[in-house]
């Protein structure tokens, strides 16, 4: 049986690792480095090149050299990414061409062809696969691939697609901070709580985990799929462009070759400023005008760089606050803070993390290699090479469906351990309703309209029946990859329908933060709206039952009670026309009391001419009703 490799498919760099002799080993590339640039190009001869070779020729071939493709994985043209940054705006920063394909898909152009992001990622994976096969001396067909914890379903599916295109069966998609925790904690004997702060080239994740006796349990996770080293580089690039325009009057942002040179210079300067206080950015012949060639020569200090990127570092701390809150932990309860990702080498990042958690971050792991090592360990677990390790990951957002009145009814709450399955029984909202629409939602708000739609599907063939009678069982299943499937089943007919959510547009970190902030800011308003809808549902249902009771028992109800019940029903219907929740509750209570009187009168008449019968127990009644929630589904 062949080896299963662990792959860290990064925005800036990628790595591949494998278990050998019970230990994880990072595999060097054909060029001798364990870090393989996530860069793909087609050169002037039409040859496809990947990795270090592609990066080295980027300045001479900027339009046909693609990097940071991970930021376009699972994305749609026109869809927001990050803080009000649509794909189009992100594309404008790249020297290569990004175009709109069918169904608003993102495509990138190299040579005379255009490619989807999974295709480009597959080229990187093929390079990793080839290097691993050369190192191991055998074919590699299976892999565990890491993704940011906050990757949505579409992004995870795009990653699996890339693996398939590269000829790899992806046995598991594993979250990057969780992989890092595996690498850190594999040989640890004591129980501890750790925070994994993962700031990579394009994404940011923070996870809180509990480690003990071989179990790695994620307590909470938060992050931003559009925050990373690329953004730090862009700050320097923007500054260089502005300074040069101020000094020379020339706008370098319009020159693709100059842009590529600026990107490389920015990345180099940023890395140097992690160990020195200032660096000189020297780019001869950056451009030319009528007077001749122009050069760029600027001094950048660490202090200036820190001023430029302070907002980005601060931006990473809000998810840390959210993760701590969701985990129920305080910073004092965190035993170790693990730094992951090359951007965490920046002194400012390390200082801010230290200030936030109140302790020195653990620097005992290689931030570039730890994720690939964790992926290899998970591969070893799946193949039985690593024993006594249990990994328990979570979902980042609440999942549910829309029910009566536009309410979002949660089935699986955020930070629930996966894999998991949850079922709940709902019913129809109208008499003789022949079909229902299942509206699958993602988000923390009480109202469906305030959450994100993941998908919709129909369940047809429901037999004619009064509302509330059909039993529709809705089941949510989330697999170990964090991918969701939803099934609806009519318990009466056995008819069922299901959908796998693999192409949802998902959420950026900013959207999640916005949802959370709105949920807190509008908590009182949301509660009031939800109470009103619940009160309306109870009132409408009671009035419906009262009207049915009148129709079915007209000859058994005394005239005075009949008149009183009609009056109370009318009062409820009138209250439902207005917006006074207290009036709705008051008339509902009065109708309930009147309905009880009618019931007593009807049963009293029956008992006069018949032997007493044992009344069903309260427990029996509860058992009959338990688990049924009235749901609103669209009538077709």
UniProtKB/Swiss-Prot annotation:
Residue numbers bearing the Phosphothreonine modification: 203
UniProt entry keywords in alphabetical sequence: ATP-binding, Chaperone, Nucleotide-binding, Phosphoprotein, Stress response
SUPFAM superfamilies for the chain: Actin-like ATPase domain, Heat shock protein 70kD (HSP70), peptide-binding domain
Biased composition (Basic and acidic residues): 618-636
Disulfide bond sites: none
Induction remarks: By stress conditions e.g. heat shock.
InterPro entries: ATPase_NBD (IPR043129), Chaperone_DnaK (IPR012725), Heat_shock_70_CS (IPR018181), HSP70_C_sf (IPR029048), HSP70_peptide-bd_sf (IPR029047), Hsp_70_fam (IPR013126)
Region of interest (Disordered), ranges: 602-636
Gene3D superfamilies named in the record: 1.20.1270.10, 3.30.420.40, Actin, Chain A, domain 4 (3.90.640.10), Substrate Binding Domain Of DNAk, Chain A, domain 1 (2.60.34.10)
Molecular function as annotated in GO: ATP binding; ATP-dependent protein folding chaperone; unfolded protein binding
PROSITE patterns in UniProt: HSP70_1, HSP70_2, HSP70_3
Function: Acts as a chaperone.
NCBIfam families, sorted: PRK00290.1, PRK05183.1, prok_dnaK
Annotated family: Belongs to the heat shock protein 70 family.
The protein's name: Chaperone protein DnaK
Biological source species: Dehalococcoides mccartyi (strain ATCC BAA-2100 / JCM 16839 / KCTC 5957 / BAV1)
Gene name of the encoded protein: dnaK
